[in-house]
Regions:
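Cytochrome P450
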Residues: 1-417
Length: 417
């Protein structure tokens, strides 16, 4: 166990109050211990890591596994409530909410499987492909802003932050325009936390759709990422049908949700800091630095995805035992005063090298350049087109999503005039 008495959290985490204002609570946890056990709303015990130095090191630590074949078993052992444990075992059995096919991707794998998957995906998801999307993203954003201009008041999440990343993912996967309405419904259900049976049916429907889509790309390739993934080889290997489906779903959830939140959180930061808006209006070359600061200040992910200790792991003066679930708090680490001076201030001039909003190590997000590109293009066009846009409600009236992983707004009501 720990070198000293095992730390514990006296705070009531994962409540509506926490999701609304997490940073003060996370600061208290960061001061008390580098890692401490907490309990999630579904009764799962996990070790929360809150300091930057330890967080960055653990993101790249090979002693922490992400292989869900191991993870599901370990998760079942880490429930503090037997009733919750029984419910988990039932839900991960024959009636699993998320079929196994959805977890055979590189985010939930370790080397050598991860190495093979990332090499194959990396050959198709190139910097040239990302750069080629710029004119299309610019045109799409301009079209959506034309719609925003028609209304005095609008929800910026629904009108802009959601449709741009969703449409870009549809371009990458090659989802035809006529199928995007139902594809969006499935996507919303997958990330909504809605009733289990409804989500499970959406998974089944999406898997069936993607199998058919992949077959069509195999027979008649298009100029999209999914077609390239179907036909890409490395050392004579290809992605299997299940791996292709899982990768498409990973793009949809990880590649889409994070960008939605980057746009929404970045816009809110600028509404609340007009002096930064003025800086960007007078010097557009500052936008890349601004995006890095948005990722630090209120990034799109509160926590990294689950990891599991394969042996005892020291975190500062605490030792996490083998077989434990570990949650790395990206939000807490990003505001560690040992890393950043005045971390609670928005400062687009600060040095954000070494940022971990998109992870670190072998699991660093392959789609990070695309997310940054979308965030920069959408936000710069938004505030160029609407320099006087402002919040329609007080900041404390905004509602944040109750998510253990995502940090994003439910709505962002604004006034255009």
């Amino acid at each position: 166990m720990a070198e000293k008495n095992t730390p514990s959290s006296p705070l009531d985490l994962f409540t509506p109050t926490f999701f609304q204002q997490p940073h003060a609570m996370l600061a208290q946890l960061r001061q008390s211990a580098p890692a401490l056990p907490v309990t999630t709303p579904n009764g799962l015990r996990t070790w929360l890591v809150t300091r930057y130095e330890e967080a960055r090191a653990l993101l790249a630590d090979e002693r922490l596994s992400k292989d869900m074949r191991v993870g599901r078993h370990l998760m079942s052992r880490n429930f503090v409530d037997p009733a919750k444990q029984a419910e988990f075992l039932k839900e991960t059995g024959e009636r699993s909410q998320f079929p196994q096919v959805l977890s055979v991707h590189m985010l939930y794998s370790d080397p050598p499987d991860h190495t093979r998957l990332r090499r194959l995906v990396g050959r198709a998801f190139t910097s040239r492909r990302v750069a080629s999307l710029q004119p299309r993203i610019a045109a799409l954003t301009a079209e959506l802003l034309d719609g925003v201009a028609l209304h005095r008041r609008t929800d910026l999440m629904e009108a802009l932050a959601f449709p741009v990343p969703f449409t870009v993912i549809c371009w990458l996967i090659g989802v035809p325009p006529g199928d995007r309405t139902v594809f969006r419904r499935w996507s919303n259900l997958l990330v909504s936390g809605a009733g289990t049976e409804e989500v499970r049916q959406a998974c089944v429907d999406m898997i069936g759709y993607l199998r058919t889509l992949i077959d069509s790309k195999r027979a008649a390739p298009d100029d999209d990422l999914l077609s390239d993934l179907v036909h890409t080889t490395a050392d004579g290997e290809r992605l299997t049908p299940d791996e292709l489906i899982s990768m498409a779903c990973l793009l949809l959830v990880a590649g889409h949700e994070t960008t939605v939140n980057l746009i929404g959180n970045g816009a809110l930061a600028l509404f609340r800091h007009p002096q930064v808006r003025d800086q960007l209006a007078s010097d557009e070359s500052l936008w890349p630095a601004a995006i890095e600061e948005f990722l630090r200040y209120d990034g799109p992910l509160t926590n990294a995805t689950w990891r599991f200790t394969t042996e005892p792991v020291r975190v500062g003066d605490v030792v996490i035992p083998e077989g434990e679930l570990v949650t790395i708090s990206l939000g807490a680490a990003a505001r560690d005063p040992e890393r950043h001076e005045n971390p609670d201030q928005l400062d687009i001039g600060r040095d954000n090298s070494g940022g971990i909003a998109f992870g670190h190590g072998i699991h660093h997000c392959l789609g990070a350049p695309l997310a940054r590109l979308e965030g920069r293009m959408v936000l710069s066009q938004l505030f160029t087109r609407f320099p006087d846009m402002r919040l329609a409600v007080a900041p404390d009236e905004l509602r944040w999503r109750s998510s253990l992983m995502m940090r994003g707004l439910e709505e962002l009501p604004v006034l255009t005039k």
